[in-house]
Amino acid sequence: MKLNPKLVVLGSLLLGLYLNAMSAAPLRVLYFTKSAGYEHSVVKHVDGKPSYSENILTALAAKHDLALTFSKDGSLFSPEYLAQFDVIIFYTSGDLLSVGTDAQPAMTAAGKQALLDAVAGGKGFIGLHSGSDTFHTGEQGGGNNPIRAQRFTNYGDKADDYIRMLGGEFIRHGAQQVAKARVIDPAFPGCAALGDRLEVMEEWYTLKEFAANDHALFVLDTAGMEGADYQRASYPLAWARTHGKGRVWFNAMGHREDIWDNPKFQALLLGGIEWAGGRLTAEAKPNIEAVAPGANTLQVYKP
């Protein structure tokens, strides 16, 4: 059977136009900031105005073709609601199945499962800062829960399903201080802006439950840091991983307003969004054992 050369050319042109249109389509991003636990100033609405972080994201979206939806309403989560987004960003806290601190509508158990299914099915997911302080294993109920001794344990495959999807979990933080982080993969989208090392004032989370397939992007240098919580081996602050068919990206930074103002943080976040949404490609091979072999050895619990 012979193909008509004109039809072949026409088909190629149409395919090219289709692919160009697809690549030119804005990434549809949900920025979800319900705080059932501690409510950070960068996500708080004051006098009905957008939050600090929402204003930063709005400016980024205008320059980089992102279609943003801002929400604190957990009751909206369903397969149909999540289907309209390419990337879901969580800057959240606490047990989102409870109304909690910000008094915004809670998620349902079915809504939480819809999120997990959406990511496993191919949606991009991004966790920022207290996105790792969300759905702690064995901690139910709203409010800013006290730090409990149980957080200083790795639960592995018994950890909450959300934590297993994210690839890590918040334990506690010490006093804000200037600290250094070593960049592991400068070729990953957004990381080139950091150079080979990041050094800033921030609230540095201690973390656990690192997944075996985490691809660490930068690692906190704990040597010389002040406070008992940092008397442990270096561990990742940011990573990328796959979860089912989905791409997951996390960055523990983002507590302070000046971090959100920092062009390096913005470039890093944009790279994460574009990678998670499939606009940019990069390998996310597991490397945590090689670059942070002691990461899952936790600090000693001290009340």
Language model: regions and residue ranges:
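Bacterial N-terminal signal peptides that target proteins for export
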Residues: 1-9
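Bacterial N-terminal signal peptides
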Residues: 9-20
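Helical hinge/lid and interdomain linker segments adjacent to catalytic or ligand-binding clefts
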Residues: 23, 28-32, 37-135
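Extracellular ligand-binding/catalytic regions of CAZymes and related secreted enzymes
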Residues: 25-27, 33, 53, 63, ...
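Extracytoplasmic/secreted proteins, especially bacterial periplasmic and envelope-associated proteins
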Residues: 52-56, 110, 114, 161, ...
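Conserved beta-strand segments of alpha/beta enzyme cores
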Residues: 67-69, 215, 247
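A glycine-rich, often tryptophan-bearing local segment used as a flexible ligand/cofactor-contacting loop or short
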Residues: 95-193
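Catalytic beta-strand/loop cores that center a nucleophilic Ser/Cys/Thr
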Residues: 158-160, 164-244
